[in-house]
Amino acid sequence: MAILRANLSPKNKLNATLKGWLPILQSELEDLEEVLKQNALDNPLIKIENKRIKNFSDRFSAKKSSDHLENFATASKSLFETLEAQIIPPLFPTETSQKIAMDIISGLNNEGYFEENIEERARILGVESEVYEKVRKRFSYLNPAGIGAKDVKESFLFQLESRELDDNELYEETRKIILNLEKHHEFSKDFYYEKALKILKSFKNPPAIEFLEKEIEVIPELFIVEVDNGIIVRLNDESYPTISLEENRFKDSGYLKEKLKEAKDLIDALNLRKATIYKIGLMLLEYQYDFFKGKELRPLKLLDLANEFNHSVSTISRAISNKYLACERGVFPIKHFFSIALDNSETSNAVIKDYLLELIKNEDKKEPLSDAKILELIEEKFHLKMVRRTITKYRQLLNIASSSERKRLYLMRA
């Protein structure tokens, strides 16, 4: 890492700039233009333009990377990530309610329905089933609407509640039809029947359908590119907004000098953001070189990165949050390349995922392993402590169905 350290800006300048412009470093690439404009609102010298290119492959001379780069431009934000961001006060005000909510998320199937046994899940968490169910009902306030329901009827009821209809009679008619979906034609002569039916047809079925059908575009900050003589890091500079100065419009004055300094500080902050992200890419390439060649991730902690930049782990964590890296293996959140801190263990999350895959591959097809059992086996093998929702998250990232879903699939194949 000596080369990386030698290229870092002087510590004092780095600290001063980051303290003043930390939001620029932490912002997502998609939001960077707006963040810069907010900083430049009162400065007539600054002009900000977005030069984002439409085709990422235009920037690469390496033929191999150009062929695949189109596939790097988008990545899917999972249902898990979308819901996890909503598990906050005031809807989930306590640690217990948040713990239950995360457990519920981990028990959702790909369509967004909760099919797990509430009594069993509550027992594992050490809470009353009534408390667990109360938290689950709060999912009616989350997006996507209908998520966390047990079945279609309850999902429709959740979505109905989220509509907040002013017409109470229309609400009651719609609710009645939902509760009697199998025989809704019996109400066809009701005054509000057609209006209620129109509302029902607008509901999402299944509730997570948007996550099954489409991907949300993300713009990678970094590209790890294979070239003839090795692998290199390239910053996605073409997606950055540009800052230009229009100082010729004003005569020399104290006001101009002050605004000119502010403008140059903003440019320095943007350049520092680029340099910081690029150096993160250099470090990842150095530490995770084997991964980019098709092998497994090495254990790497955020603390290692924080030490390189002389900043706290929390600052670095915020700096890489919601930022992506594209390589031949796909598009990944930058945080993907760091091990999860597990009681100071050096065990990489990639190693745990591999073992999880092995367990699923060799499980009893009649009695598939629950996440709780997988947790028990992993803790025993690696001599560490984890929480079950971490296992569930790993399973979902690996596109492995829940134990109940796997059991149904095994029966279908038998």
From Swiss-Prot:
GO terms for biological process: DNA-templated transcription initiation; regulation of DNA-templated transcription. The keyword Endoplasmic reticulum does not apply. Residues 301-320 bind DNA. Belongs to the sigma-54 factor family. A motif (RPON box) lies at residues 387-395. Keywords: DNA-binding, DNA-directed RNA polymerase, Nucleotidyltransferase, Sigma factor, Transcription, Transcription regulation, Transferase. Pfam families: Sigma54_AID, Sigma54_CBD, Sigma54_DBD. One of its GO terms (cellular component) is DNA-directed RNA polymerase complex. This is RNA polymerase sigma-54 factor. Sigma factors are initiation factors that promote the attachment of RNA polymerase to specific initiation sites and are then released. PANTHER family: RNA POLYMERASE SIGMA-54 FACTOR (PTHR32248:SF4). GO terms for molecular function: DNA-binding transcription activator activity; nucleotidyltransferase activity; sigma factor activity; transcription cis-regulatory region binding.
